[in-house]
Design a protein with these regions (language model features):
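Extended, structured, electrostatic nucleic-acid-contact surfaces
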Residues: 1-4, 198-223, 231-237
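Short alpha-helix plus adjacent loop in nuclease-associated cores
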Residues: 75-123, 164-166, 261-263
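Gly/Thr-rich phosphate-binding beta-strand-loop-beta motif of the actin/hexokinase/Hsp70
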Residues: 2-21, 99
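Glycine-rich, often acidic, oxyanion-interacting loops/wings at catalytic, nucleic-acid
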Residues: 126-216
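Acidic beta-strand-to-loop metal/phosphate-binding motif
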Residues: 49-57, 99
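Phosphate-backbone recognition surface of nucleic-acid-processing proteins
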Residues: 85, 216-263
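Short glycine-rich, Thr/Ser-proximal phosphate-binding strand/loop in the N-terminal lobe
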Residues: 12-37
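Short, basic/hydrophobic alpha-helical segments
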Residues: 34-51
Length: 263
C-alpha cells in the first residue's frame, strides 16, 4: 500500500469510519472500526507527515489531543463546511470521504483544538446555562400553578422569591393543604437551583482571576468574569484569526448574509 497522505475520520458513539488517500489523491484505505480499536489501528497504519481530519463534533477535541500528542497534524472542520463535499447519500463511509476531501481545500477554515482547560471552562458555562433554563422553567411552572388558585405571580424572579413564602404562610388565600405542600417542594427546588447557579458563578469568578488571558480581557469596558472566561473557552489562541471580524464571525456575532448579486 502506498503511503497515506490524509485520513478523514467520521466519529460516532461506537463505530468509526476511516478514509485515507495517498499523495496522488487516490483512495487506498477504508476501514470501519470499533471505538476500542480504531486509534491503535490508525497509529499502526499511518506514518509521520500524514494529516488527519475530523468534524468538530462531540469527542473530536479529545481524539485530536490524543493524536497531536503522538506528533500528528489534526484538522477539525465545522460540519457545515463538510456537507458540500458529500457526494451521494449520507452515511459513515461517505462522510469520512467528504471530511478527507474537505480538509484538502486550500481555503478551508478549521477549528482550533481545545485544551483540557478550555473544555473545563466550557463545561462550567454549559452546566450554568442549563441550570438557568431549569430555573426559568421552574419559576414559570410556579406562576402557572398558583394562577389556578387565583394568585397573581410577579414576573421578576426576585419578586417571585419574596412572594412564595408569603403565600405559604397566608392561611386565607385559598390554597389547599396538599397544594401548599407541593408549592413548598417547588420552592425548595427553586432555592436549590439558585444555590447551584451561585456556586458556579463563584467558580467562574475564580477561573477569571486565575487565567491571565481572562484577566486581560476584563480590562476592557463591559467585560466581566462571565464574558472573559466564555471567550477563553470558545477562542483560546486568538492568533488563529487574521482580524477581529473573523473572530466575531466564528462566535456568531456578525449577521449572516442571505443576499445575492453582490449587493
Amino acid at each position: 500500500m502506498n503511503k497515506l497522505s490524509r485520513v478523514g475520520i467520521d466519529l460516532a458513539k461506537s463505530v468509526y469510519q476511516l478514509h485515507g488517500v495517498d499523495r496522488s489523491e487516490q483512495t487506498i484505505w477504508r476501514r470501519r472500526l470499533t471505538r476500542g480499536k480504531w486509534l491503535k489501528v490508525l497509529l499502526d497504519t499511518i506514518e509521520p507527515g500524514c494529516e488527519i481530519g475530523m468534524e468538530a463534533c462531540a469527542g473530536a477535541h479529545h481524539w485530536a489531543r490524543q493524536l497531536q500528542a503522538k506528533g500528528f497534524t489534526v484538522k477539525l472542520i465545522a460540519p457545515q463546511f463538510v456537507k458540500p463535499y458529500v457526494k451521494s447519500n449520507k452515511n459513515d463511509a461517505n462522510d469520512a470521504e467528504a471530511i478527507c476531501e474537505a480538509m484538502s481545500r486550500p481555503h478551508m477554515r478549521f477549528v482550533a483544538v481545545k485544551t483540557v482547560e478550555q473544555q473545563d471552562i466550557q463545561a462550567v458555562h454549559r452546566i450554568r446555562s442549563g441550570l438557568l433554563s431549569q430555573r426559568t422553567a421552574k419559576a414559570n411552572q410556579i406562576r402557572g400553578l398558583v394562577a389556578e388558585y387565583g394568585l397573581v405571580a410577579p414576573q421578576q424572579l426576585a419578586s417571585l422569591r419574596a412572594a412564595i413564602p408569603s403565600w405559604l404562610e397566608d392561611a386565607e388565600n385559598g390554597l389547599s393543604a396538599r397544594f401548599r405542600r407541593l408549592l413548598n417542594d417547588l420552592w425548595d427546588d427553586l432555592k436549590y437551583l439558585d444555590q447551584r447557579i451561585t456556586a458556579l458563578d463563584q467558580e467562574i469568578t475564580t477561573l477569571a482571576q486565575q487565567d491571565p488571558v481572562a484577566q486581560r480581557l476584563q480590562q476592557l469596558r463591559g467585560v466581566g468574569p462571565l464574558i472573559a472566561t466564555a471567550l477563553v473557552a470558545a477562542v483560546g489562541n486568538a492568533e488563529q484569526f487574521s482580524n477581529g471580524r473573523q473572530m466575531a464571525a466564528s462566535l456568531g456575532l456578525t449577521p449572516g448574509q442571505h443576499s445575492s448579486g453582490g449587493k
